[in-house]
Amino acid sequence: MKKILVAVVVALFSINAMAQHEIGAIVGGMNGASYKYWFNDALALQADLAVGLTEAAGKTSVSQYDFTLNPNVEYHWALPVENLKIFAGGGLNFGLCNNLKYGNSNTVAGKFGINAITGLQYDLASVPLALAFDFRPGYGMSFDKNSNTSHFFDWKIAFAVRYKL
């Protein structure tokens, strides 16, 4: 039993030794805070808490802006350029949005959706910074207190700067 306990403790410490945290800011279609947790060299969880314009805003009567939590799971592949990776994955987005109704009435609505994510990340060699550029197409729905539901396709382009902890 002691051997199993020692093996589990060693495994937990080795997981933390591989883990890398990044924290910073994201700007573009979303503006806010960005956090990335690396499970290993290729698999990461990225979570962004941001305010932004919904890209469908000028084309539909769905939403003008949103406040979103957007967690994504990403898989990274190394490219021939040193410290440059391409990534792809998917995630959820949920939060609040300013729901524009027919006429001129404005209501705050809940929002939920799914999205894909793809982009490039460059890790600076001389300082512990990561620069990332990503594209996020997605599908979502907003719902207000009167059970009115709106469906929309949305996309965001964003640039992130994160400090490696």
Segments the model singles out, each with a brief description of its role:
Residues 4-13:
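Sec-dependent N-terminal signal peptides
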Residues 21-34, 51-65, 81, 143-152:
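Solvent-exposed loop/turn segments connecting transmembrane beta-strands
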Residues 104-107, 148-154:
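Flexible, surface-exposed loop regions and adjacent strand-edge segments
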Residues 153-165:
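Outer-membrane beta-barrel "beta-signal"
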Residues 13-19:
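Sec/Tat signal peptide C-region and signal peptidase I cleavage site
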Residues 136-144:
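Short helix/strand-capping connector loops at secondary-structure junctions
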Residues 37-133:
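Gram-negative (and chloroplast) outer-membrane scaffold detector with strong preference
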Residues 134-136, 160:
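C-terminal binding/interaction regions
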